[in-house]
Amino acid sequence: MREALRSLLVALQFLTRLPVRLSAMPTPEQFGRAVLCYPLVGVLIGVVLYAAARSLDGTPPLLQAALLLSLWVALSGALHLDGLADMADAWVGGLGDRERTLAIMKDPRSGPVAVVVLVLVLLLKFSALAALLGQGEAGLLPLAPWLARSSLPLLFLTTPYARPGGLGQAIAEHLPARSLPWVLGVSFGLALAFGLAGLLALLVTLMLFAWLRSRFLARLGGTTGDTAGALVELTECAVLVALAL
């Protein structure tokens, strides 16, 4: 039980800006085990968003959507948005070359492509949130962060790490590979409790995952922390849009 709790705390500290403080820096093995808790972190984010949406009942949908999106970004500390921005710059500037793409992803500066992609993704999220709230479907909000963070263990389990060294490789090398399929099966299966909406969200998640993973492999031969972050953001966006249509 103590190890399970520590794994959850490591995952919360890594994926969110919630005030979680550990007594010592987690080991690579602990970072690897924490991947089991990524779906649960997504559930917790979703519950916070749902509770916030309910507390804002009666607020105009556009303002409510803006406040929820701001909270959403704050909860993750824009961690995954940063990965999306880096990947967008690298995918365009890399000109199809693996080494050039990896080099651009390490550059902390953001170019115009990154800015445009971030604006478009946030605009789509905002619009989809406003539509869902206007339809009285706030109860579906947890599906987006939940399934997006469930896709991370699937990515790490099925895709080699493209860049030697760093935290990403340490996580990849210490994945609890035997337990992950069970965790993923439960996480994806529970999404079906949302009925047809859950089935739609799950199908969108898996289809987008398969397509993005194929792009990562074709360009990089694997994944990186930035592409993992981009996967989260794009999955959240796609699920929200699909549910709002």
From Swiss-Prot:
| Domain of life per record | Bacteria
* Pfam families assigned: CobS
Report the top EC class in one word. Answer: transferase
GO terms for biological process, alphabetical: cobalamin biosynthetic process
The catalysed reaction is:
alpha-ribazole + adenosylcob(III)inamide-GDP = adenosylcob(III)alamin + GMP + H(+); alpha-ribazole 5'-phosphate + adenosylcob(III)inamide-GDP = adenosylcob(III)alamin 5'-phosphate + GMP + H(+)
Pathway annotation from the record: Cofactor biosynthesis; adenosylcobalamin biosynthesis; adenosylcobalamin from cob(II)yrinate a,c-diamide: step 7/7
According to its UniProt record, the EC number is 2.7.8.26
The places in or outside the cell where this protein is found are: Cell inner membrane
Please name the GO terms that the record assigns under molecular function. adenosylcobinamide-GDP ribazoletransferase activity; cobalamin 5'-phosphate synthase activity
Which NCBIfam families does this one have? cobS (TIGR00317), PRK00235.1-5 (NF001278)
Protein name as catalogued = Adenosylcobinamide-GDP ribazoletransferase
Q: Which organism is it from?
A: Pseudomonas aeruginosa (strain ATCC 15692 / DSM 22644 / CIP 104116 / JCM 14847 / LMG 12228 / 1C / PRS 101 / PAO1)
